[in-house]
Every structure is written in structure tokens, then in C-alpha cells.
């Protein structure tokens, strides 16, 4: 389904929060949206693996890595796991790696930066907790919308039918 965050802001500005423009797109899909699932972890991605093994249809994983860019929280293997399980997208407040492979995958991925160093594989962190970055607090069950222009957040799903009637 087509989305345009600029048009969504024109219509729903009073209902959405706009994430600060600190993210770049690294996935093969430029527009994505879905219900938020959150994980908070620092330089390890064991919990991320556990979450991405779940059915991700209609869901976007928000990863609060503390803004650290010393280790990549998402790589090609995890992104492929997300694709295989139907996730709509991943937003990483941290780093990703294996960018050439990520760009070929059928998933949206936004992150702060690339780095070649991988994360530890420990299951340390918290799942489904509020996370705050980019000037916005993300709650589990919120709805996030992302494209190349930006990322916006809503407590309720936004009506998208008018964008897809053309």
C-alpha cells in the first residue's frame, strides 16, 4: 500500500509525532508502516533474533540501541529472518551492517549508520517497553509510518485508503 509521510502530515499533523531526521534508509523497501513492537538492547541482538522469529505481518520492529554505532544490531541474516516472517520494517536507533545485501531485501530498514562490526548475541534487554529517541516516545501498539522523507508515529492507525484510490 502506498504511503507518503508528507501527505500524512498535511492531513494528520495534530494526530502524529514526527521523528527527528536522524535516520537513513538501508532496506530494499522505501515505504513501510505497521504496528510497533519495541525492544531495548545495547550492542547485542539476541532478543532481536527472538522477536524476528515471530510472525511480523503488519508489524514494525523499533530497536532502541541507545544510539550506539560501534556495533551493528541488524545484519543480512536478521533482515532475511524478518523478511521470511513477514515483517513490514525495522527502525534501528543504532547501526546496521552488510548494506549491499540489505538494499536487495524486500523490507524497509531505517538506521543511524552502517558499521562492519557485528553485535553480541546475548539475550539482554527489554521487550515491549516504551522507548524514546528522535524526539519521540514509541509505545508498543502505536503505529509507525516511514518513507525516504521521514518517520511519523500515531497512537491510532491512520486512514490510508485515499492514497490508494488513484
UniProtKB/Swiss-Prot annotation:
Q: How does it assemble?
A: Homotrimer. Binds to both RNA-binding sites in the C-terminal region of Rne and to RhlB.
Q: Where in the cell is it found?
A: Cytoplasm
InterPro entries named among the record's database cross-references: RraA (IPR010203), RraA/RraA-like (IPR005493), RraA/RraA-like_sf (IPR036704), RraA_gpbac (IPR014339)
The question of whether Cytoplasm is a record keyword is answered with: yes
What family name appears in the similarity comment? Belongs to the RraA family.
Q: Which UniProt keywords apply?
A: Cytoplasm
Q: Give any GO molecular function from the UniProt entry.
A: endoribonuclease inhibitor activity
Xref: NCBIfam families: NOT-MenG, PRK09372.1, RraA_entero
The answer to whether keyword Cytoplasm applies is yes
Q: Which SUPFAM superfamilies match?
A: RraA-like
Q: What does the entry give for GO biological process?
A: regulation of RNA metabolic process
Instruction: Please give the name of this protein.
Output: Regulator of ribonuclease activity A
Any Gene Ontology CC annotation: cytoplasm
Q: What does this protein do?
A: Globally modulates RNA abundance by binding to RNase E (Rne) and regulating its endonucleolytic activity. Can modulate Rne action in a substrate-dependent manner by altering the composition of the degradosome. Modulates RNA-binding and helicase activities of the degradosome.
Amino acid at each position: 500500500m502506498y504511503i507518503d509521510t508528507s501527505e500524512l502530515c498535511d492531513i494528520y499533523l495534530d494526530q502524529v509525532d514526527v521523528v527527528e531526521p536522524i535516520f537513513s534508509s538501508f532496506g530494499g523497501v522505501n515505504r513501510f508502516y505497521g504496528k510497533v513492537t519495541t525492544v531495548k538492547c545495547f550492542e547485542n541482538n539476541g532478543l532481536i533474533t527472538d522477536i524476528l522469529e515471530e510472525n511480523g505481518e503488519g508489524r514494525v520492529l523499533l530497536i532502541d540501541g541507545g544510539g550506539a554505532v560501534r556495533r551493528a544490531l541488524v545484519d543480512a541474516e536478521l533482515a532475511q529472518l524478518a523478511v521470511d516472517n513477514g515483517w513490514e520494517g525495522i527502525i534501528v536507533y543504532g547501526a546496521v551492517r552488510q548494506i549491499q545485501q540489505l538494499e536487495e531485501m524486500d523490507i524497509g530498514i531505517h538506521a543511524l549508520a552502517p558499521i562492519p562490526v557485528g553485535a553480541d548475541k546475548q539475550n539482554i534487554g527489554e521487550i515491549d517497553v516504551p522507548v524514546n529517541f528522535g524526539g519521540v516516545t514509541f509505545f508498543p501498539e502505536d503505529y509507525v509510518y516511514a518513507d525516504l522523507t521521514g518517520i511519523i508515529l500515531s497512537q491510532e492507525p491512520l486512514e490510508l485508503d485515499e492514497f490508494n484510490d488513484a
